[in-house]
Amino acid sequence: LFDAAELAAKYLPAHGHGDALSFEWSVFGQRVVINPGVFEYDAGKFRDLSRSTKSHNTVTLDNYDQSEFWKSFRVGKRANIINCNNIIKNDSFTVTASHNGYTRLSKNPIHSRKISMYPDKIKIEDSIEKGNGQNAVARIMLSPDISVEMNDRNCFLLGKGFKILVESDNKISLKEAWCFLDFGHR
């Protein structure tokens, strides 16, 4: 599942989240990469966290959200998808998309993501065009049912009946995060 759609309906952005170019992934019916869900609709830290870009499987620049979230149900400047393309071949599928949510930052950075799927691997490539050297952080939220083994550059995701190698050109770190699989439960 890949989110390359508008933030929300233009007339009702209240339920929009900072999830442009985010993805979810299941293996053999088991959720691996998840959307962490929503805890509450009332104003507060968990509402803000649920909507934030850092709580989704995408990239933050200098820890900014892709869109400007105000209070519990308002949105200011919004990230918009500015292109989305896909290529289907016999044994692979590739989707590429970009958004303009960070153009309010210095030198108008554009985040692009390319996800390529093959029979034996998935490759995710993020790039930042323009910009002013902002610190880019890609986050991936794992299901609580997934175990992790890791070293500096690689990690293994362990589920029921599978073990997946994750490789990166950058350092991988593991941090705990909030997950709201059911509304109102943490």
Q: What residue spans do the PLM features occupy?
A:
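Carbohydrate-active enzyme catalytic cores, enriched for enzymes
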Residues: 1-34, 88-89
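CBM-like, beta-strand-rich accessory domains located in the C-terminal region of large
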Residues: 38-186
